[in-house]
């Protein structure tokens, strides 16, 4: 959700029970404004909150003028002081995939994981136990990256792609119509396209290259991983991810108000294919 309209956005997303105390809201409003100024970001998004056993991580993201350029991620434990996180790498994601359970809420906390490694001694091969330590900060970076790639979404038309390459905020976007807002095909993944590149020319024939340049939600696997509901007498559409419980997207049809927020434990629902 955009930090410039934080209070309205929190109110629209509150139907899922994702609220903040008045003092946290006030701290966020002020500190995110300073983050935008100090880091010179084009936009700052309040990404959400990852719940820990000792403390919670409040996450924000800074966007450059090109909206699909890699986003800078920051975290805070008190909504006042923000620390920049390193970009996610494949090695980080692989390392963190072995860690299960809740976050602690301490970035310096280290998880211990035991791995078996083969050791050659002459002609004999032995398996040796090695203890690998993984920092919670590494896991935090990895989980945020996975959630971004899997379930960060925007409505069709909110961004447009120029013929020269960069992607900008569409200032003429006035919201989806009520009928369009009820369709999963009206929402895109907020990242570089993956599936779009595999489509045939015939499938791309009806697409507008300036608007339909990202992957649509309608072909997400597993099918049925999104819940879509109309609330407040059709004045608000809410999408919830069943794959990453805690991710809520909201949009008020025929208005510019949209956004997503994640409030959860940072754990993926691996059982979803068996639950559908």
UniProtKB/Swiss-Prot annotation:
Task: Tell me the first and last residues of the signal peptide.
Answer: none
Q: Which gene encodes it?
A: RSPH9
Source species: Homo sapiens (Human)
An example Gene Ontology biological process: motile cilium assembly
Query: Any idea what this protein is called?
Result: Radial spoke head protein 9 homolog
Q: Assembly and interactions?
A: Component of the axonemal radial spoke 1 (RS1) and 2 (RS2) complexes, at least composed of spoke head proteins RSPH1, RSPH3, RSPH9 and the cilia-specific component RSPH4A or sperm-specific component RSPH6A, spoke stalk proteins RSPH14, DNAJB13, DYDC1, ROPN1L and NME5, and the RS1 complex-specific anchor protein IQUB. Interacts with IQUB. Interacts with RSPH3B. Interacts with RSPH4A. Interacts with RSPH6A. Interacts with CFAP61. Interacts with LRRC23.
Output the InterPro entries linked to this UniProt entry. RSP9
Q: Which disease is it linked to?
A: Ciliary dyskinesia, primary, 12: A disorder characterized by abnormalities of motile cilia. Respiratory infections leading to chronic inflammation and bronchiectasis are recurrent, due to defects in the respiratory cilia; reduced fertility is often observed in male patients due to abnormalities of sperm tails. Half of the patients exhibit situs inversus, due to dysfunction of monocilia at the embryonic node and randomization of left-right body asymmetry. Primary ciliary dyskinesia associated with situs inversus is referred to as Kartagener syndrome.
Which terms in the GO cellular component ontology are assigned?
9+2 motile cilium; axoneme; kinocilium; motile cilium; radial spoke head; radial spoke head 1; radial spoke head 3; sperm flagellum
Describe the function of this protein.
Functions as part of axonemal radial spoke complexes that play an important part in the motility of sperm and cilia. Essential for both the radial spoke head assembly and the central pair microtubule stability in ependymal motile cilia. Required for motility of olfactory and neural cilia and for the structural integrity of ciliary axonemes in both 9+0 and 9+2 motile cilia.
Q: Where in the cell is it found?
A: Cytoplasm, Cytoskeleton, Cilium axoneme; Cytoplasm, Cytoskeleton, Flagellum axoneme; Cell projection, Kinocilium
Stored PANTHER family: MITOCHONDRIAL RIBOSOMAL PROTEIN S18 (PTHR22069), RADIAL SPOKE HEAD PROTEIN 9 HOMOLOG (PTHR22069:SF0)
Disulfide bond found in the keyword field:
no
Task: Reply yes or no: does the keyword Cytoplasm apply.
Answer: yes
Listed A to Z, the keywords are: Cell projection, Ciliopathy, Cilium, Cilium biogenesis/degradation, Cytoplasm, Cytoskeleton, Disease variant, Flagellum, Kartagener syndrome, Primary ciliary dyskinesia
- Name the protein family: Belongs to the flagellar radial spoke RSP9 family.
């Amino acid at each position: 959700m955009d930090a410039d309209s934080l209070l309205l956005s929190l109110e629209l997303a509150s139907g899922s029970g994702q609220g903040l105390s008045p003092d946290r809201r006030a701290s966020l409003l002020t500190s995110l404004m300073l983050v935008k100024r100090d880091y010179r970001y084009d936009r700052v998004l309040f990404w959400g909150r990852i719940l820990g056993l000792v403390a919670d991580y409040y996450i924000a993201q800074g966007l450059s003028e090109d909206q699909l350029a890699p986003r800078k991620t920051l975290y805070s434990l008190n909504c006042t002081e923000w620390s920049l996180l390193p970009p996610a790498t494949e090695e980080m994601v692989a390392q963190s995939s072995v860690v299960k359970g809740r976050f602690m809420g301490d970035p310096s906390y280290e998880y211990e994981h035991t791995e078996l490694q083969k050791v050659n001694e002459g002609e004999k091969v032995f398996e040796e136990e090695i203890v690998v330590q993984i920092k919670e900060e590494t896991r935090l970076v990895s989980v945020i990256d996975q959630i971004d790639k899997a379930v960060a979404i925007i409505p069709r038309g909110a961004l447009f792609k120029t013929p020269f390459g960069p992607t900008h905020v569409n200032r003429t976007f006035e919201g989806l119509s009520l009928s369009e807002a009820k369709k999963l095909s009206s929402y895109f993944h907020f990242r570089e396209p993956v599936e779009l590149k595999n489509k045939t020319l015939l499938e791309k024939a009806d697409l507008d290259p300036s608007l339909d340049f990202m992957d649509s939600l309608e072909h997400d696997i597993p099918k049925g991983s999104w819940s879509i509901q109309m609330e407040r007498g059709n004045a608000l559409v809410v999408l919830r991810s069943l794959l990453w419980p805690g991710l809520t997207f909201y949009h008020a049809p025929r208005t510019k108000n949209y956004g997503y927020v994640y409030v959860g434990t940072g754990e993926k629902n691996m059982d979803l294919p068996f639950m559908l």
